[in-house]
UniProtKB/Swiss-Prot annotation:
Family annotation (InterPro entries): COG3_C (IPR048685), COG3_N (IPR048320), COG_su3 (IPR007265)
Residues with the Phosphoserine modification: 507, 647
The entry's keywords: Golgi apparatus, Membrane, Phosphoprotein, Protein transport, Transport
Localization in the cell: Golgi apparatus membrane
PANTHER family named among the record's database cross-references: CONSERVED OLIGOMERIC GOLGI COMPLEX COMPONENT 3 (PTHR13302), CONSERVED OLIGOMERIC GOLGI COMPLEX SUBUNIT 3 (PTHR13302:SF8)
Annotated region (Disordered), positions in chain: 470-489
Molecular function as annotated in GO: cargo adaptor activity
Further comment found in the protein's record: Present with 4140 molecules/cell in log phase SD medium.
Membrane topology: Peripheral membrane protein
Gene Ontology biological process: autophagy; cytoplasm to vacuole targeting by the Cvt pathway; endoplasmic reticulum to Golgi vesicle-mediated transport; Golgi organization; intra-Golgi vesicle-mediated transport; macroautophagy; pexophagy; retrograde transport, vesicle recycling within Golgi
Signal peptide as annotated in the record: none
Name by which UniProt lists this protein: Conserved oligomeric Golgi complex subunit 3
Function: Acts as a component of the peripheral membrane COG complex that is involved in intra-Golgi protein trafficking. COG is located at the cis- Golgi, and regulates tethering of retrograde intra-Golgi vesicles and possibly a number of other membrane trafficking events. COG3 is also involved in actin cytoskeleton organization.
Amino acid sequence: MARSRKNSLVRDIASHPTIPESQTIVGLLDDSYLFDKLKKLSLAVENSDSLQRTDVSEGCSEVNGSEATTSADVKKTNKYLYYTTYLDQLNIKIDEYKVVLDQTRQVNDQLDSSIKKFRKISQDTGAFIEETKTIYEKQSKLSNLTESIPKALHYFEVLDPIMRRLNHATSPAIVKKSSFTTMLATIDESLRFLDENSDLKDAAAYRIKFKQCLIRACELISHFLTNLLKQTNQEILDKTKNKNSLTGLPSTTRDAFLYSKFYTIADTFKIQVSEIVKRSNEKAYNKYHDELNSILYECFNHYFQTRLRLLTPVIWSHIDEIVVKDKDQGLVKFIQDGKVYFQQLCADEYKLFVEFFPEKECRFKINQWFLQLCEPLYDSIRVRVLKETDICTLCDSVTLFAPYYEFEEGSEEYVKQFTDIQYDKLFEPIVQKVQARLILRVQIYVQQNILSYRPTRDVFMISNRRRKSKTSLQGGNEDATTSDDNPDPLLESYLSSFKNRSILPISPNDADDKSIDSEESTDKISQLQTYYPPLLKTLALLSKIYEMINSVVFDDLAHHVVHDCIVSLRNAYDMVIKSSAGKSDFNNLDISLAYLKNLLMLRDSIQNFNIQYTVNETYLDFSGVEGFFKSLKENGRNVLKKTKSSSILTLARELVPKVVNNMVDARTELISELRNVIKDFTESTSLELIDDTLDINSDEDLLSKNVKLRENIKARLPRIYEQILNYIDDQEIVTNLLDAVQELITQSYSKYYETITELAENGKFAKDQVADVMYLDVFTDFFAKEVADLLRNGDIDTITK
């Protein structure tokens, strides 16, 4: 048992070598029970010793005599021997453990010392590594710098040879050598290096010098190209003796001089100019774009000037031929011939240009030059346009260029349409000039044919009826086209367009349908001719100029034209109404219906033009000045006396012109005018139907007047309905007019019935008389039935016809 404990204790110490001594001792004496037993054993041993000493003095015989007693004491002493032995062993073990503990502490201290040494070695090693790394990086940097210095110095060293070569260049032909191209590449590399390494000493100064070398090299290229163009131009002039002789050459010979000769130098030119174009469009050269673009534009200008000097005599010669050929032709033919020639000319020039310059980067420049090339065309057409007075001709001229303005600029279709030559920009000056002339002629046309129109007394009479006899239609067709001896081409074109709409390719079996279409078109034209002449001219004008000018400009014009037409219609209507007052041969209902018919025609027609904008019109009102001078003329000194009595500031305020902002909205004005004429018509119709039947007079019989009212409605309403049908062919409008008349008469009858009922209650009328009068709801049903019968019979007649 003792060995096993020893082995376990040694094993425990070996596994926990750093446990302190105090903790080990406490562990051995941790058994409180054993400690108590040891205390008791100690007391017992002391008591036993004292008893033995007392017994020795009394006598040894007693001890010797009684072996049994001694044997018992020995046994008692041997009883604690195990514990004492154990205690001794514990003390020995404690001493041994103390030795082991001291050794362990010594080993631990040695380990701590070793760890500290290792840590110091690790720190020293890390510092060594960092220092070594820094030294290595410096060494690598210095090595790279050592290797890059010769390369960097190369960019600086090449400057002097390049400058000497450029400054001592005796001829621009040096640009044709391959070494010149290599030199340009070296300049590019040097500039790129200096831009990337701007922190180098004197980098800015060297960059400026290299930039000067680049500009100088590009200038040499430009001079070479200029000389090449001059030389080619001079060769052509020498062969033709003088520049005007090109116009007398055959077309094939002329093309050989103008184009074939230039094609021979195109490759050389393009190779050199591409060097400038490439650098002008390179992002790395943003700092030098101004100088490079200036040199490139100089190349453009020399090329264009050379071409223009050769082409101008030929162009003017051809324009003179067109002028002579189209002398008796109209403006449209002249523009068309010029347009065809210049289209071909621009196509040929574009084809030649892309052989001299890179197409993608330089396309914009040739399109700009085309405007200068076409100036002879602009000038010649401008002269012809200023002489043109016919609106139809001006519109047809604009139509020639319509295919170029179908798509919005910048759209995908637009880009596909103008991949090379932008014909929309090329012909835009012509279109603008023609449109400006067209707008001027439109304003003059409105002034002469609409505002200045003087209507006749019967302008709203029978000639405006919807139905006319076939004889009158056939006989009056030619005369109805115009109201005077001067035919109006615009109106004739407008009326003939209705006839042309029915002319379509047909088979022999469709002859009957063709006859029907012809009759319908003739009837349509005849019906149109019954309208107010300024109205027809307004519609003819708007339909002709629609989509011929800018939409905003058209809306502005359309508002003013429609406004002027409404003013002309209203003036004619007022004039006829005044002239018909008190005359039996005029019927106000016919006049109102004719006026309404024209307004409806105007309303329906302008919807097709999609007028969208309201026009704000600003002008100065000088009515105060005019009124002052008028008063001065009429009253003389009295005005001056009033002026003295009043404030001078008041007079000055009255004389200052006023700024008037007027909003022109033709659609709103037209709707307002329609409401007014419908109101006038319903009131006139109601008065004719009612007559004096709703006049209240105590001396008259109410029943007889009520019967007369019913008779008036039955007798006159069908006639009024016929009058409406003579002018209005829209059944919905006819129904609305009758409904408006019915509503107004019903309101009048309602007031009348309430009045006579009150009078009967007050005793002014006999109640039996009021009882004989139709009730309001009975009268309403009666009138509604009459209207319904008229409309039903009218629908049957329409279907039968």
